[in-house]
From Swiss-Prot:
It comes from the Bacteria. The gene is ihfA. GO terms for biological process: DNA recombination; positive regulation of metabolic process; regulation of DNA-templated transcription; regulation of translation. Pfam families: Bac_DNA_binding. This is Integration host factor subunit alpha.
């Protein structure tokens, strides 16, 4: 893992380099796309980006949890949560990238 975090500015820079829009237009495009995704999620709509992922808001019912230190039962309030489900295409890409990094990290076996 590289540990790098990709920011809005990184996305805008990538659009600038690959698409050819100006830096300002690239930043506006990234902001517009993110705003549209956020607005749809807030409205309770499912956002499905083919070959990438699905974002969805889910209602969780009230339930009983347990304090791990004391063992005491604690009610957990009902709430809405957002879920992110990676597509099979993305999952496959991640697995291939992981396998490739793992193979590169493995030292070559010297011939005996």
């Amino acid at each position: 893992m590289t540990g790098k975090t990709v920011t809005r500015a990184d996305l805008a820079e990538s659009v600038f380099r690959k698409v050819g829009l100006s830096r300002t237009e690239s930043a506006e495009l990234v902001e517009t796309v993110i705003d549209e995704i956020c607005n749809a999620i807030v409205r309770g709509e499912t956002v499905k980006l083919s070959s990438f992922a699905t974002f969805q808001v889910r209602d969780k019912n009230e339930r009983i949890g347990r304090n791990p230190k004391t063992g005491e039962e604690v009610p957990i309030s009902p709430r809405r949560v957002m879920t992110f489900k990676a597509s099979n295409v993305l999952k496959t890409r991640i697995l291939k990238a992981h396998a490739s990094r793992k193979a590169k990290a493995r030292p070559a076996n010297p011939a005996s």
